[in-house]
Amino acid sequence: MFRTIARVLVPVGMVSVVLAPLASAQVSPSLPNPIAAPNPLTTTISIFRSNMQDKIRKAADAMPESKYEYRPTKDVRSFAEILDHVAAISYSLCSSAKGETPPATTTGKVSKTKIVADLKGAFEYCDGVYLGFPDAYLNAPADFWGVKTNKLFILTQVANHDALHYGNLVTYLRLNGVAPSGGWF
């Protein structure tokens, strides 16, 4: 029995090793190589964050404006409120990492266009923070709503928060018969 399993698994493993580079090259050839970047840690975090933010943008675009006030139950945020929340927290976390006061934002946007514009502004603000952030500064002290931590923690929380709420958005889309954009990248 062991030999039969080995006869199947060894060739499959060999093929996997040979094809893995080809498969990974097809995931997203446009991603920067963090190993070659001047700030590989910040670049790695930024790749994940950018991917999540792209997915959130696509979810915001995919949901019809008539469904922006949709909420699966009365005690959770609406689709629009999640997007507002993501924008506000992106501004808050990225400004904290940069050591600035968060830019003024408004909540309770009245249209899909305004909500998407604010979301785009928040993501662009974070882009500027990540692009100018050296790895050497990642262990600098930071405040996470009263918790003493470092800048690395703050920057990872931007991507973590986006991923958390992207999961909410996918559920809202599917409950409304809208297919989210697929894939890892």
Model-derived features with residue positions:
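Cleaved targeting-peptide boundary
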Residues: A25-P34
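Well-ordered alpha-helical scaffold segments within catalytic/enzyme domains
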Residues: K55, A59-A60, C94, Y125-Y130
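Short, contiguous alpha-helical
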Residues: V27, S46-R57, K67-T105, D143-F185
